[in-house]
């Protein structure tokens, strides 16, 4: 039961809320022509008003239809039930909505007021009137006449007048039918853009006016209603003569606007139509179509001849806002032209607003009587204002003329409710005459007024009135109870019992006060405390004895005066502040908050720091603490002091609190790497390392604390193809993939260490150099790589000094070797033939060479030469190949001219592709000034030693030998002699760094001299024989020195560097051979050439003495036992013919001695590269070195004499010197043995690949030499006694089978750091002549890989 009652109450409240929300609308649908007393709807149910119980209302619910006096309503409503019924008035849609377009709905609206005021609502009810088929379609005339020319084509169509049906929709015209057409004509129905159906007559057979000139039939029209209605008309077709051109309107659709107050006769529009015919057939007749409404025909006139449309009667937009005029233009034919004229009648403010007053409160003699105590918002009447104008002209506002306690509240468009806006007072105003004004927004505006009268009924509505509206009283705290404060009084305008007043304390009065009921005296009954309550605000009531009684109130404000009875109170007994250590001096540390319950000066607190602490200050008023010092958490982490608070009372009170300031760490330290210690350290990573192995660990520390000291690691650059990964917490660098040959070399990994500090994280970076190789044997070289790599920018996935392995370049080397060898053999053969025929032209060619240009790179641009693997194998042309021929010959003791066992080492190498970096002569700046001399053409020496004077040993008329006087020092440093553009500048302008660490190595060279023995080197004086220099190197059985006589066992090493490209530095000779200029030599020449066709040059075109051209006069070294035979050709007269004045200042240039450049194919015929040592070795001075070291010296030879070098060893440390050359020559490999080892060099053969066999017994320095045997017939013989204690000599059964992974360079520590970069030695295969271990009399033969 409770649940049901609760639901009912909720529904009632919901209904009240709905009704309280404002006006409502309700829509109903009715059909036209409905009979009387038909139930339309029930508002009580439709608006859910049945949920409101009648017992909660003051009066019963009523429904009142609000309509204008004089109107005949189409509906009525039952006042008690809210049911809506039809009345006896006819509901005719066509009449009610005559002015509404046919395609719009027809509505009828009424308003219903729901009473009483508790639930008052004004409901607007809209009735949608549905059309019924109560009208039949009718033709405009019962007889329709139409003319058709006799030559009309079959299926020609002629428009017939359309029928009109006042009904709409399906009840309108739907179909046309032709009756008794005799199959001559047919009928078609088309729909116009306006939605009207137009009948068209179709000619189905040929017409002949002479045979029959008139056809009579019937046309029937039907609607779609139920029941269906129809009508017929007689159609008379007249066959006329031919008129084959129809009129054509210039514009078929015209829209015009005309104001509704336009006078009669005003032109609306001018129609223009043309006809291509002539004569009578071209005369156009204008007429309205029968579809034009009668109203339009009444208002507009169409001139049949000119087509001018004018106003026939005054227009009224309120009656019809627009008109559609369908105009036909006919030339007498059956196909008139059609044009639609849309006339929009614009509004003119010509209608005065109307005011319609519909009373909700029943008036008495047109006067509404209201009680003065009626509630606010009491609805009095519904005011409706209308204006027939449109837009702003029809926008009406309604208002009253002066201030009254009533207002107009809009509920619908142009409808207002008159209701009370204030309480009525009979004593002030007893009657109201309200003037209502309605005005539109036109220019000028039109207005209308109406009067409404209201009388006020008197009631007991006066309450007592206090003489003071606000009472203020003050009293000190700690008072005595019973003190009287004040007296209040009030008056009442009423009389009698209604004027008798009683005083009462209001419900908000505190218990500390009491009030006398009759006198109004206010008294304090308790002791007051201002700290508990500093003021009291309450009301005092004055109540009369009326029925019902009326009351009024006055507000009393009691203020408590403060006394200093409280000490200052800190918000905390102890304050702890946390400040960052980087807080600036005098920054804000914190705020001390102190309260004092007292008021005024008693609560004015002053703060100070006790104990005279000068480290901090405190604002005495705000309590802000600021430091006078700079914090450093590492020195002191906290500070403690006391703060005193003292109030400003007459007798002051104080208190104190402890303050502790804690210094908090800030992220002011970057992580610092301790491992690796610097960017120059490196770590070895073996290529065989398994993926997932930790290859290195970086360690960084942060001096901060907490999260500011937490370090995270990441790789931010230099990680080639993600080969490495790093653990962000431990710093362990892990190898992610298996290393292949492409990964060998130095990897520069950029590691970033950042802390987790907030708000900004700090970081540091370090370069971790990871060297991927089998071992670290040349630390100096790696350090140099690392040093130079620091100068290169670090980009993502950067690999520094990529080391190409023999395995990855094996195919490339083989292709280069085959192509180079075959090409050089063919070119040398052709060149040998051609050069024999070109001797007369060489002089002119030499002069042309003087005009060659020399380029000089900037020595300041030191760049790390990056050796990167080629993505594609280039086709090696002969000009990119250089063949190094090394002939090591052993002369029989009994026959110095014997050609016995010889081994020729043919060393093909593509230095441009595999070894030497290309120098960019376009982008590299030079140090030349525009007006400076060409220092590249001179070789000025800064050495204090005098230049050598070469004494010729052959006649001066020899045209194959040119000797230049060169200084002792190396004043020329070049990048490489076989690159595309070899540097040929002097030292101050030369390239400062020509090293290629990844592909070269070098060995220090020192000469061990002894006191004079039996053999000395003969001085270089003119003689018929070759000049010979003998150098004693290690003890041998005493033999008589016989020069080149029998019984003298010696080892000859001859180096020949035939020119392989246009960039080669060696000269190809000067022309045909002169027999008289040659010295006697007994050994075979390289590539099997005849002696007379092989030419050498004493000084290559781009070399100086420092590059290996030792002066022949420096060959006198006294006290040498063994000798290296050096044949020096005499100089020629042309040596100084071309010298200029600049030569006296800057030194001799190439123009003094260099011949003109020859054809590259022919110049490769007989090139010989001079193998020279640095200045100390090329001079004639005697140098004494430590006994264990025995070196072999490579000295320059002058062409065409083949030079020989005797290779000897000292007893305990069997060491072989490096055939070392200063740049840009390609240096020979070093055959080195560590001192404790008395082992010989091992010449090992690796069958699988043409790899270089390691010729070394020093484990930390595994040098590799790669040698190829030439395809020519030359050979080199190795004496078994060449090395003593040859325990390590490898035979076939002891060959190194695993040499496929050997490198033909080393990365270990450089043995000679002061020298320039180490040069490349090409690959060579050593093969024994026999399968067995060679005996003492046999020597292994070094053969080229059989490609």
UniProtKB/Swiss-Prot annotation:
InterPro entries in the cross-refs: Cadherin-like_dom (IPR002126), Cadherin-like_sf (IPR015919), Cadherin_CS (IPR020894), Cadherin_N (IPR013164), Protocadherin (IPR013585)
Segments of this protein annotated with the region Disordered: 1031-1050, 1057-1091, 1097-1116, 1325-1347
Localization in the cell: Cell membrane
Membrane topology: Single-pass type I membrane protein
Topological domain spans for side Extracellular: 24-812
GO cellular component: plasma membrane
Membrane-crossing segments per the record: 813-833
Stretches in topological domain Cytoplasmic: 834-1347
Domain annotation Cadherin: ranges: 26-139, 140-249, 250-355, 362-466, 467-570, 571-673, 677-795
Any one GO molecular function term: calcium ion binding
Major localization class: membrane
Pfam families attached to this UniProt entry: Cadherin, Cadherin_2, Protocadherin
Glycosylation site residues: 27, 48, 54, 344, 553, 773
Role: Potential calcium-dependent cell-adhesion protein.
Name of the protein described by the UniProt record: Protocadherin-11 X-linked
Organism name: Pongo pygmaeus (Bornean orangutan)
Gene: PCDH11X
């Amino acid at each position: 039961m409770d649940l049901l009652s609760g639901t009912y109450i909720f529904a009632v409240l919901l209904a009240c809320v709905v009704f309280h929300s404002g006006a409502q609308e309700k829509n109903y649908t009715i059909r036209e022509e409905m009979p009387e007393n038909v139930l339309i709807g029930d508002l009580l149910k439709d608006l859910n008003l049945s949920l409101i119980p009648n017992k909660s209302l003051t009066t019963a619910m009523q429904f009142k239809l609000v309509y204008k006096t004089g109107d005949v309503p189409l509906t009525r409503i039952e006042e008690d039930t809210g049911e809506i019924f039809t009345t006896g008035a006819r509901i005719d849609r066509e009449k009610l909505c005559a002015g509404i377009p046919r395609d719009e709905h027809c509505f009828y609206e009424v308003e219903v007021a729901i009473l009483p005021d508790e639930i008052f609502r004004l409901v607007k009810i809209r009735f949608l009137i549905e059309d019924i088929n109560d009208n039949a379609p009718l033709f405009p005339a019962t007889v329709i006449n139409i003319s058709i020319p006799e030559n009309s084509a079959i299926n020609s169509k002629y428009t017939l007048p359309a029928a009109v049906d006042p009904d709409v929709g399906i009840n309108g015209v739907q179909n046309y039918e032709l009756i008794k057409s005799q199959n001559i004509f047919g009928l078609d129905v088309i729909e116009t853009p306006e939605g009207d159906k137009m009948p068209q007559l179709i000619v189905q057979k040929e017409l002949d006016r002479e045979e029959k000139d008139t056809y009579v039939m019937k046309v029937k029209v039907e609607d779609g209603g139920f029941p269906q209605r129809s009508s017929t008309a007689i159609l008379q077709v007249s066959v006329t003569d031919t008129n084959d051109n129809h009129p054509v309107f210039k514009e078929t659709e015209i829209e015009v606007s005309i104001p509704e107050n336009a006078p009669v006769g005003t032109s609306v529009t001018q129609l223009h139509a043309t006809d291509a015919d002539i004569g009578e057939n071209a005369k156009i007749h204008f007429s309205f179509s029968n579809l034009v409404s009668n109203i339009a025909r009444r208002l507009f006139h169409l001139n049949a001849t000119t087509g001018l449309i004018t106003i026939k009667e005054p227009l009224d937009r309120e009656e019809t806002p627009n008109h559609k005029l369908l105009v036909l233009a006919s030339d007498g034919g059956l196909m008139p032209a059609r044009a639609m004229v849309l006339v929009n009648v614009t509004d003119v403010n010509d209608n005065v607003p109307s005011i319609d007053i519909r009373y909700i409160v029943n008036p008495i003699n047109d006067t509404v009587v209201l009680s003065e105590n009626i509630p606010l918002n009491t609805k009095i009447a519904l005011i409706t204002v209308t204006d027939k104008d449109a837009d702003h002209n029809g926008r009406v506002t309604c208002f009253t003329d002066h201030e009254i306690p009533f207002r107009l509240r809009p509920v619908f468009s142009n409808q207002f409710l008159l209701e009370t806006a204030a309480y009525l007072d009979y004593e002030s105003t007893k009657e109201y005459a309200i003037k209502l004004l309605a005005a539109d927004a036109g220019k000028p505006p039109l207005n209308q007024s109406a009067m409404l009268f209201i009388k006020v009924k008197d009631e007991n509505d006066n309450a007592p009135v206090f003489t003071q509206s606000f009472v203020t009283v003050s009293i000190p705290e700690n008072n005595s109870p019973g003190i009287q404060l004040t007296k209040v009084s009030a008056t009442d305008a009423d009389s009698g019992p209604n004027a008798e007043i009683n005083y009462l304390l209001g419900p908000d009065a505190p218990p500390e006060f009491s009030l006398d009921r009759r006198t109004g005296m206010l008294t304090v009954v308790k002791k007051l405390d201002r700290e508990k309550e500093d003021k009291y605000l309450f009301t005092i009531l004055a109540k009369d004895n009326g029925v019902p009684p009326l009351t009024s109130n006055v507000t009393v404000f009691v203020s408590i005066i403060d006394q200093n009875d409280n000490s200052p109170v800190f918000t905390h007994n102890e304050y702890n502040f946390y400040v960052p250590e980087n807080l600036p001096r005098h920054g804000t540390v914190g705020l001390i908050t102190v309260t004092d319950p007292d008021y005024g000066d008693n609560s004015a607190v002053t703060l100070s720091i006790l104990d005279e602490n000068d480290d901090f200050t405190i604002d005495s008023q705000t309590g802000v603490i600021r430091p006078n010092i700079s914090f450093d958490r590492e020195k002191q982490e906290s500070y403690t002091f006391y703060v005193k608070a003292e109030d400003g009372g007459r007798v002051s009170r104080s208190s104190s609190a402890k303050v502790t300031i804690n210094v908090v760490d800030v992220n002011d330290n970057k992580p610092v790497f301790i491992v690796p210690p610097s960017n120059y350290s490196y770590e070895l990573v073996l290529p065989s390392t398994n993926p997932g192995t930790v290859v290195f660990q970086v360690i960084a520390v942060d001096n901060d604390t907490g999260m500011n000291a937490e370090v995270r690691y990441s790789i931010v650059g230099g990680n080639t193809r993600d080969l490495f990964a790093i653990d962000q917490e431990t710093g362990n660098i892990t190898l992610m993939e298996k290393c292949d040959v492409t990964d060998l070399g130095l990897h520069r990994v950029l590691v970033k260490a950042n802390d987790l500090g907030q708000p900004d994280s700090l970081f540091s970076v370090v370069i971790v150099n990871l060297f991927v190789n089998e071992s670290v044997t040349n630390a100096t070289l790696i350090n140099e790589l690392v040093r130079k790599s620091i100068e290169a920018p670090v980009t993502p996935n950067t690999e520094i000094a990529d080391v190409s392995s023999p395995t990855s370049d094996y195919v490339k080397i083989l292709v280069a070797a085959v192509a180079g060898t075959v090409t050089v053999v063919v070119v040398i053969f052709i060149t040998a033939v051609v050069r024999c025929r070109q001797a007369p032209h060489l002089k002119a060619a030499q002069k042309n060479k003087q005009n060659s240009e020399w380029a000089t790179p900037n020595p300041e641009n030191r760049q790390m030469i990056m050796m990167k693997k080629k993505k594609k194998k280039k086709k090696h042309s002969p000009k990119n190949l250089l063949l190094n021929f090394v002939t090591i010959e052993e002369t029989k003791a009994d026959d110095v001219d014997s050609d016995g066992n010889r081994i020729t080492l043919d060393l093909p190498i593509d230095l441009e592709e595999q070894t030497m970096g290309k120098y960019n002569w376009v982008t590299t700046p030079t140090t030349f000034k525009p007006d400076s001399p060409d220092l590249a053409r001179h070789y000025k020496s800064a050495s204090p030693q005098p230049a050598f004077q070469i004494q010729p040993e052959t006649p001066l008329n020899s045209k194959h030998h040119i000797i230049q006087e060169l200084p002792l020092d190396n004043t020329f440093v070049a990048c490489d002699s076989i690159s595309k553009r070899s540097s040929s500048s002097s030292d101050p302008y030369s390239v400062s760094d020509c090293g290629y660490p990844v592909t070269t190595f070098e060995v220090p060279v020192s000469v061990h001299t002894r006191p004079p023995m039996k053999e000395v080197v003969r001085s270089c004086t003119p003689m018929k024989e070759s000049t010979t220099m003998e150098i004693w190197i290690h003890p041998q059985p005493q033999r008589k020195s016989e020069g080149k006589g029998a019984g003298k066992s010696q080892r000859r090493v001859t180096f020949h560097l035939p020119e392989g490209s246009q960039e080669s530095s060696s000269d190809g000779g000067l022309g045909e051979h002169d027999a008289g200029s040659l010295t006697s030599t007994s050994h075979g020449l390289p590539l099997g050439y005849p002696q007379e066709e092989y030419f050498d040059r004493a000084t290559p075109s781009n070399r100086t003495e420092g590059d290996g051209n030792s002066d022949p006069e420096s060959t006198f070294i006294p006290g040498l036992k063994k000798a290296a035979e050096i044949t020096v050709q005499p100089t020629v007269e042309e040596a100084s013919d071309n010298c200029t004045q600049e030569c006296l200042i800057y030194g001799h240039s190439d123009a003094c001695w260099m011949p003109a450049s020859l054809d590259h194919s022919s110049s490769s015929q007989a090139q010989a590269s001079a193998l020279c040592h640095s200045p100390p070795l090329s001079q004639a001075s005697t140098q004494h070195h430590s006994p264990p070291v025995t070196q072999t010296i490579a000295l320059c030879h002058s062409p065409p004499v083949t030079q020989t070098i005797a290779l000897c060893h000292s007893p305990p440390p069997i060491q072989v010197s490096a055939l070392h050359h200063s740049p840009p020559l390609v240096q020979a490999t070093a055959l080195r043995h560590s001192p404790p080892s008395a082992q010989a060099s091992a010449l090992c053969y690796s069958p699988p690949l043409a790899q270089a066999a390691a010729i070394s017994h020093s484990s930390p320095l595994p040098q590799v030499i790669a040698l190829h045997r030439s395809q020519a017939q030359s050979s080199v013989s190795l004496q078994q006694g060449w090395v003593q204690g040859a325990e390590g000599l490898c035979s076939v059964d002891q060959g190194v089978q695993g040499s496929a992974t050997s490198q033909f360079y080393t990365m270990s520590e450089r043995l000679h750091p002061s020298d320039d970069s180490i040069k490349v030695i090409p690959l060579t295969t050593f093969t024994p002549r026999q399968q067995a271990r060679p005996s003492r009399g046999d020597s292994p033969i070094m053969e080229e890989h059989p490609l």
